[in-house]
Amino acid sequence: MDTLVIAGKSYTSRLLLGTGKYKDFTETRAAVDVSGTQIITVAIRRTNIGQNPDEPNLLDVLPPSQFTLLPNTAGCYTAADAVRTLRLARELLDGHALVKLEVLGDQKTLFPDVVATLEAARILVKDGFHVMVYTSDDPIVARQLEDIGCAAIMPLASLIGSGMGILNPWNLQIIIDKVKVPVIVDAGVGTASDAAIAMELGCDGVLMNTAVASARNPILMASAMRKAVEAGREAWLAGRMPKKIYQATPSSPSEGMITGSPHSAANN
């Protein structure tokens, strides 16, 4: 079976889904179910998973017994804040070690601060975390994060929440070719074709939130994204035909084609 393996655990779904921006927890659960995802991301600074006892708890709707939770550090702008946030998540989730690290460098673009990201990754890996890390599409940084010991590299396709799709497929392709841990596109996916393209490039998975939660029909979009990720993966496994410039090839065989008879040719 074709599975995604992260930190030693296998998953049949290659779609990772965020839990923010839905109108309520009921819609969140419905989108998660339709998407078929097995890994859901949770922004610890914005979502209650037990740190606020008097508020609705996401874990009542998406229990850890049914899904792999991926606590993330959305909203963190320093390595220290990111490390502190994920240590809190580990306490709230009874020692859960799989986390998503993101250290932002700019409030307007939400580009990652790669220097702070590298610093936080070193601390977290040394502290026993399995770190899936949001980063730029710089292949050198991706290799450095892999060398530190990160469990998955998560380069952006374009700005978080922009829906602009994959702006630099060439860098993504280099990252895919150079690192051995899973490469999961994170940020910028806007519609199903973006997810399919990411998978056709050879990405191991796609993480999204806004593309589903901000769609006119989030539940239907979750279904579309599931199919797109599956189709893109199958296309990559199948191997696309080579592109040819100025070399058209008929799809029908040329043998046995009907040609004009010598008699008719002579009469002409």
UniProtKB/Swiss-Prot annotation:
Q: In which pathway does it act?
A: Cofactor biosynthesis; thiamine diphosphate biosynthesis
In its keyword annotation, does this UniProt entry include Cytoplasm? Answer: yes
InterPro entries listed in its UniProt record = Aldolase_TIM, Thiazole_synthase_ThiG, ThiG
Q: Where is this protein localized, as stated in its record?
A: Cytoplasm
**Does the entry feature the keyword Plastid, yes or no?**
no
Q: Which GO terms describe its molecular function?
A: thiazole synthase activity
User: Which Gene Ontology cellular component annotation is one that this UniProt entry carries?
Assistant: cytoplasm
Q: What is its main location?
A: cytoplasm
Active-site residue numbers: K100 (schiff-base intermediate with dxp)
Q: Where does 1-deoxy-D-xylulose 5-phosphate bind?
A: G161, A187, G188, N209, T210
Enzyme Commission (EC) number = 2.8.1.10
Swiss-Prot/TrEMBL keywords = Cytoplasm, Schiff base, Thiamine biosynthesis, Transferase
Q: Name one GO biological process term.
A: thiamine diphosphate biosynthetic process
Q: Which reaction equations make up its catalytic activity?
A: [ThiS sulfur-carrier protein]-C-terminal-Gly-aminoethanethioate + 2-iminoacetate + 1-deoxy-D-xylulose 5-phosphate = [ThiS sulfur-carrier protein]-C-terminal Gly-Gly + 2-[(2R,5Z)-2-carboxy-4-methylthiazol-5(2H)-ylidene]ethyl phosphate + 2 H2O + H(+)
Region called Disordered, residue ranges: 248-268
Q: Name one Pfam family in it.
A: ThiG
Concerning HAMAP family, the annotation shows: ThiG
Q: How does it assemble?
A: Homotetramer. Forms heterodimers with either ThiH or ThiS.
**What is the purpose of this protein?**
Catalyzes the rearrangement of 1-deoxy-D-xylulose 5-phosphate (DXP) to produce the thiazole phosphate moiety of thiamine. Sulfur is provided by the thiocarboxylate moiety of the carrier protein ThiS. In vitro, sulfur can be provided by H(2)S.
This chain's protein is named: Thiazole synthase
| Source organism per UniProt | Nitrosomonas eutropha (strain DSM 101675 / C91 / Nm57)
Name the gene behind this protein.
thiG
